[in-house]
Protein backbone atom coordinates (compact mmCIF):
# COMPACT_ATOMS: atom_id res chain seq x y z
CA UNK A 1 0.00 0.00 0.00
CA UNK A 2 1.41 3.37 -1.02
CA UNK A 3 1.78 6.06 1.58
CA UNK A 4 0.00 9.36 0.83
CA UNK A 5 2.27 12.17 -0.34
CA UNK A 6 3.11 14.78 2.25
CA UNK A 7 5.01 18.02 1.96
CA UNK A 8 8.66 17.82 3.07
CA UNK A 9 9.22 18.86 6.65
CA UNK A 10 5.82 17.52 7.79
CA UNK A 11 2.86 19.57 8.87
CA UNK A 12 2.22 21.72 5.84
CA UNK A 13 -0.39 24.46 6.01
CA UNK A 14 -2.75 22.28 8.07
CA UNK A 15 -0.12 21.95 10.80
CA UNK A 16 0.23 25.71 10.93
CA UNK A 17 -3.42 26.47 11.59
CA UNK A 18 -4.00 27.75 8.06
CA UNK A 19 -6.89 26.46 5.98
CA UNK A 20 -7.85 27.12 2.37
CA UNK A 21 -11.02 28.96 1.42
CA UNK A 22 -12.17 31.02 -1.53
CA UNK A 23 -10.65 34.13 -0.03
CA UNK A 24 -7.28 32.52 0.68
CA UNK A 25 -5.88 31.17 3.92
CA UNK A 26 -8.14 31.33 6.98
CA UNK A 27 -7.83 30.51 10.66
CA UNK A 28 -10.23 29.81 13.51
CA UNK A 29 -9.53 30.74 17.08
CA UNK A 30 -11.51 28.45 19.42
CA UNK A 31 -11.78 29.65 22.99
CA UNK A 32 -13.65 29.35 26.24
CA UNK A 33 -14.48 32.32 28.44
CA UNK A 34 -15.75 32.93 31.94
CA UNK A 35 -18.82 34.99 32.87
CA UNK A 36 -16.82 38.24 32.72
CA UNK A 37 -15.76 37.69 29.06
CA UNK A 38 -12.20 36.73 29.99
CA UNK A 39 -10.62 34.01 27.82
CA UNK A 40 -9.78 30.80 29.68
CA UNK A 41 -8.28 28.67 26.89
CA UNK A 42 -7.23 29.23 23.27
CA UNK A 43 -6.86 26.73 20.40
CA UNK A 44 -5.89 27.67 16.81
CA UNK A 45 -7.07 25.53 13.87
CA UNK A 46 -7.37 25.85 10.09
CA UNK A 47 -10.45 27.79 9.00
CA UNK A 48 -12.27 24.88 7.39
CA UNK A 49 -12.03 22.66 10.50
CA UNK A 50 -15.37 21.94 12.19
CA UNK A 51 -16.00 23.59 15.55
CA UNK A 52 -17.17 20.41 17.27
CA UNK A 53 -13.80 18.70 16.72
CA UNK A 54 -12.12 21.22 19.04
CA UNK A 55 -14.71 21.07 21.84
CA UNK A 56 -12.78 18.59 23.97
CA UNK A 57 -9.31 20.21 23.51
CA UNK A 58 -10.68 23.65 24.44
CA UNK A 59 -12.33 22.38 27.62
CA UNK A 60 -9.27 20.33 28.60
CA UNK A 61 -7.01 23.40 28.39
CA UNK A 62 -9.01 25.29 31.05
CA UNK A 63 -6.86 25.93 34.12
CA UNK A 64 -8.02 28.46 36.72
CA UNK A 65 -5.62 28.77 39.68
CA UNK A 66 -7.13 28.87 43.14
CA UNK A 67 -6.13 31.64 45.53
CA UNK A 68 -3.58 30.09 47.84
CA UNK A 69 -2.30 26.52 47.68
CA UNK A 70 -4.01 23.77 45.75
CA UNK A 71 -4.48 22.39 42.28
CA UNK A 72 -5.98 24.63 39.59
CA UNK A 73 -9.64 24.25 38.77
CA UNK A 74 -10.16 22.37 35.49
CA UNK A 75 -13.93 21.84 35.32
CA UNK A 76 -16.42 24.63 34.59
CA UNK A 77 -19.75 24.74 36.44
CA UNK A 78 -21.72 24.84 33.20
CA UNK A 79 -21.23 25.23 29.46
CA UNK A 80 -23.43 27.18 27.04
CA UNK A 81 -22.66 26.43 23.39
CA UNK A 82 -24.30 26.96 20.00
CA UNK A 83 -25.81 24.36 17.68
CA UNK A 84 -22.42 23.46 16.19
CA UNK A 85 -21.75 21.47 19.39
CA UNK A 86 -25.16 19.77 19.46
CA UNK A 87 -23.98 16.24 18.75
CA UNK A 88 -23.72 13.02 20.70
CA UNK A 89 -19.97 12.98 21.38
CA UNK A 90 -19.96 16.55 22.78
CA UNK A 91 -22.96 15.88 25.03
CA UNK A 92 -21.51 12.52 26.12
CA UNK A 93 -18.18 14.17 27.01
CA UNK A 94 -19.95 16.78 29.16
CA UNK A 95 -22.05 14.08 30.85
CA UNK A 96 -18.97 11.97 31.61
CA UNK A 97 -17.27 14.96 33.28
CA UNK A 98 -20.44 15.96 35.16
CA UNK A 99 -20.71 19.39 33.53
CA UNK A 100 -24.16 20.95 33.13
CA UNK A 101 -24.75 22.19 29.60
CA UNK A 102 -27.16 24.30 27.61
CA UNK A 103 -26.90 23.45 23.92
CA UNK A 104 -29.87 23.89 21.57
CA UNK A 105 -30.87 20.88 19.50
CA UNK A 106 -30.38 21.09 15.73
CA UNK A 107 -33.64 21.11 13.79
CA UNK A 108 -32.66 18.12 11.63
CA UNK A 109 -31.77 15.98 14.66
CA UNK A 110 -34.98 17.13 16.34
CA UNK A 111 -36.97 16.05 13.27
CA UNK A 112 -35.16 12.69 13.21
CA UNK A 113 -35.92 12.16 16.91
CA UNK A 114 -39.60 13.00 16.39
CA UNK A 115 -39.77 10.74 13.34
CA UNK A 116 -38.68 7.78 15.48
CA UNK A 117 -41.59 8.39 17.84
CA UNK A 118 -41.24 6.91 21.31
CA UNK A 119 -37.96 5.20 20.32
CA UNK A 120 -36.43 8.62 19.60
CA UNK A 121 -35.99 9.35 23.30
CA UNK A 122 -36.48 12.51 25.28
CA UNK A 123 -35.31 15.87 23.99
CA UNK A 124 -32.17 17.21 25.67
CA UNK A 125 -32.77 19.69 28.46
CA UNK A 126 -32.56 23.33 27.40
CA UNK A 127 -32.69 26.39 29.67
CA UNK A 128 -33.34 29.57 27.69
CA UNK A 129 -32.26 31.89 30.53
CA UNK A 130 -28.90 30.17 30.85
CA UNK A 131 -28.47 30.14 27.06
CA UNK A 132 -28.77 33.95 27.00
CA UNK A 133 -25.39 34.05 28.76
CA UNK A 134 -23.75 32.44 25.72
CA UNK A 135 -23.09 35.91 24.31
CA UNK A 136 -20.20 36.22 26.77
CA UNK A 137 -18.08 34.11 24.41
CA UNK A 138 -18.99 36.38 21.48
CA UNK A 139 -18.03 39.41 23.55
CA UNK A 140 -14.75 37.74 24.54
CA UNK A 141 -13.94 37.15 20.86
CA UNK A 142 -14.73 40.80 20.10
CA UNK A 143 -12.43 41.93 22.92
CA UNK A 144 -9.63 39.78 21.51
CA UNK A 145 -10.18 41.14 18.01
CA UNK A 146 -9.80 44.71 19.25
CA UNK A 147 -6.11 43.88 19.01
CA UNK A 148 -5.22 44.38 15.35
CA UNK A 149 -2.68 41.55 15.19
CA UNK A 150 -5.28 39.05 16.45
CA UNK A 151 -8.00 40.31 14.11
CA UNK A 152 -5.90 40.24 10.93
CA UNK A 153 -3.41 37.41 11.56
CA UNK A 154 -0.39 38.27 9.52
CA UNK A 155 1.61 35.53 11.28
CA UNK A 156 2.37 32.44 9.22
CA UNK A 157 3.06 30.00 12.01
CA UNK A 158 0.45 28.70 14.45
CA UNK A 159 2.66 29.10 17.50
CA UNK A 160 3.43 32.72 16.56
CA UNK A 161 -0.28 33.52 16.17
CA UNK A 162 -1.01 31.82 19.49
CA UNK A 163 1.84 33.88 20.95
CA UNK A 164 0.05 36.99 19.65
CA UNK A 165 -3.38 35.98 20.94
CA UNK A 166 -2.16 34.95 24.40
CA UNK A 167 -0.84 38.41 25.43
CA UNK A 168 -4.07 39.92 24.07
CA UNK A 169 -5.99 37.56 26.36
CA UNK A 170 -3.66 38.49 29.20
CA UNK A 171 -4.38 42.21 28.75
CA UNK A 172 -8.11 41.44 28.92
CA UNK A 173 -7.51 39.67 32.24
CA UNK A 174 -5.42 42.56 33.58
CA UNK A 175 -7.97 45.21 32.60
CA UNK A 176 -10.99 43.50 34.17
Predicted region positions:
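Helix-centered, glycine/charged polyanion-binding patches within enzymatic domains
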Residues: 48, 67-154
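Structural motif
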Residues: 19, 153-162
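A short secondary-structure junction signal
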Residues: 2-4, 41-44, 52-55, 89-92, ...
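Short conserved beta-strand segments at catalytic cores or DNA/RNA-binding microdomains
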Residues: 27-39, 48, 55-58
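Charge-patterned, long linear interaction tracts outside catalytic cores
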Residues: 164-176
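Generic alpha-helical structural context detector
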Residues: 57-60, 142, 169-172
Amino acid sequence: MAEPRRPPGGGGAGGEGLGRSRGGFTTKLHLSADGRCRPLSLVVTPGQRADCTQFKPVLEKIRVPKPGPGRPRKKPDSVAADKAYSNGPCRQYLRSRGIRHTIPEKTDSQAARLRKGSRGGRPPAFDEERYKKRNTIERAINRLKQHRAVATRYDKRRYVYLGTATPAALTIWLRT
